[in-house]
Amino acid sequence: MGASFKFIHCADLHLGSTFTGLSSSEPELGERMRSSIFEALDAIVSKAKEEKVDFVIFSGDIFDSSNETPLTRSRFADALAEIKAPCFVCFGNHDYKRRWESTIPFPKNAFVFPEKVVRVKFVKNKKLAAIITGASFCNDLSFEDPTVTVTGSSEAFTIGVFHCNLENSGQDDDYAPTDLQSLLSKDVDYWALGHIHKREIVHETPYVVYPGNAQGRNHKESDEKGAYLVTVKEDVVTDMQFFRTGPILWKDLELDITGKEDIAEILSQLDGIEEGSMLRITLKGSGILDSMARLDPQGISELIESRTKCKVTKIDILTKPPIDLSAREETGDFLSAVINYGNRLETASREDLMEMICSTNTARSLRSRFEEFSDEELRQIVRDATYMIVEKMTEAAR
């Protein structure tokens, strides 16, 4: 009869993340984000104690780059001690340097995988329950497959613990690359992977799993972040329960003004948004609220923050006036001339756009500021100007 046990699989805590840009512009918010990283660790500890798990796996990037300070090292060591159950740790490309290993040692219940693949036996009730195999990064630019020498075992349920990049994962880098077919061929029952900041069960039976990072740090890491509670009965995974650890959500939201006549109708689209979330808002559609959106996007951001108790990190205005621009292009009147001229400017070169925008003495004095804008931002300025003129002319004709 096979063994039965429960464990937590987590990864990419990035303890010590500094949020430098946010901290310099909004110190209180920066401190809140820094604290959220440690709150995610606390949530893992609480879940481990609540569920009385048999062990916990940390699949790399526990610390953020060189930010394994005495404080972060101590906080993690204390967390391992509080868990009490065995903890299996591999280090990744961000935390391969371990500066305080001798002066701030981990507790005895922690096992840190070395740079070469090793196996560890997990014994429960005096019987072999699982074999856990893994390795840590030796530097931050490892481009070799760390799983090459891994072999599973028919002796017991086998878990592979690695910080690696699976093919077609969507990552820009190719650190520690491996491929799915290779993993599936190794007689390993559960691959506990880290590195990809996106939660994904890549394959079942055998399981190939990325839990994602424990707390989102930007809009690329949106929605709920957490870890997996895994139940194994008689050497078979019977339950995979995701649980949230990150206290702060990053959300991308699109709000449509089409058919809306009142700002309250726009705000109603935000019902149910969790208080304290970080929001990137895109206003889209066509309607009478276009003018307000373009004239005062900052005011709309502040209104959204007031109503939702969230932080708006960015607001993009992609709305249009409540007229059919395509149809008006063909009318041959002054309004169609404005629309057509605006369309031509949008396709102009950056140099031509700059010359047009900086054609007055006042604008020329601000040219260095305009030079900081991207090509798309310059085109958005032209687009906004076109839409504003169209709206003013349309209102005047009523």
Residue ranges with predicted function:
Residues M1-P27, K225, T231-L253:
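Domain-start "cap" segments at the beginnings of catalytic or binding domains
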Residues M1-P70, D375-R383, E391, A396:
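N-terminal active-site segment of His-dependent metallophosphoesterases
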Residues C10, C90, F113-E115, A135, ...:
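Conserved beta-strand termini and adjacent loop/short-helix elements that scaffold enzyme active sites
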Residues L29-S36, I131-S136, I248-D262:
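Acidic/glycine-enriched edge-of-secondary-structure segments
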Residues A40-I44, R75, E265:
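Well-ordered alpha-helical segments embedded in enzymatic catalytic cores
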Residues A43-E51, A79, S268-G272:
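A generic secondary-structure signal
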Residues D239-R398:
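Accessory, non-catalytic peripheral segments of nucleic-acid enzymes
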